[in-house]
Amino acid sequence: EIGGTVGDIESLPFLEAIRQFANDIGKEKTLFIHLTLVPFLKSSDEIKTKPTQHSVKELRSIGIQPDMVICRSQQSIPLDQRKKISLFCNIPIKRVIETVDVKTIYEAPISFFNEGLDKQVFEYFNIKPRKKINLKPWKDVTKIVTNKNIRTVNIAIVGKYVDLKDAYKSLDCLLYTSDAADDA
């Protein structure tokens, strides 16, 4: 995972490193997955694919062709828009994976599974899955985490950047998951 925005100067050394890595070990042993936001504009009631097209173009300009695109959106992306992403990003339609925003990050793997992300990774590397994937434990955890009837406890976090939502994200997640584990 590189993180950030494609084209930002901070990420360029890392992008160059993974480009060289792919060349060194061989393209058949690497899979570039590009996570992109596909915004929905309420004012025009449409999904915009242009930002995704531009970010893939930017990746290509530095020598990286994504093999798969995961499109994050507020709502389901119509097939014609997915085909457009496929066409202009030079990625097979089956590797244009959508993930609609979920309530909690614990739902994301279930969403990816439902979209066939695992199958596409297996197929890309020519790997036969050994057994059927059992998502029941993951679904159980998700159910616990999304349960609205859990008790609440007030905990104060004292720090310099408490007004910034993500400043203490890891601590927030730790407290959240420890409570879910306690309810399990």
Which residues does each PLM region occupy?
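Flexible inter-domain linker/hinge segments
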Residues: 93-154, 161-170
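Internal gly/pro-rich beta-alpha loop/helix module
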Residues: 30-126
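Conserved beta-strand elements of the Class I
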Residues: 33, 154-156
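Substrate-engagement module of ASCE P-loop NTPases
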Residues: 21-24
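Switch II (G3) loop of P-loop NTPases
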Residues: 2-4
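Single conserved hydrophobic/aromatic residue that forms the stacking wall/gate
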Residues: 176-184
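His/Asp/Glu-rich metal-coordinating catalytic cores
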Residues: 10-19
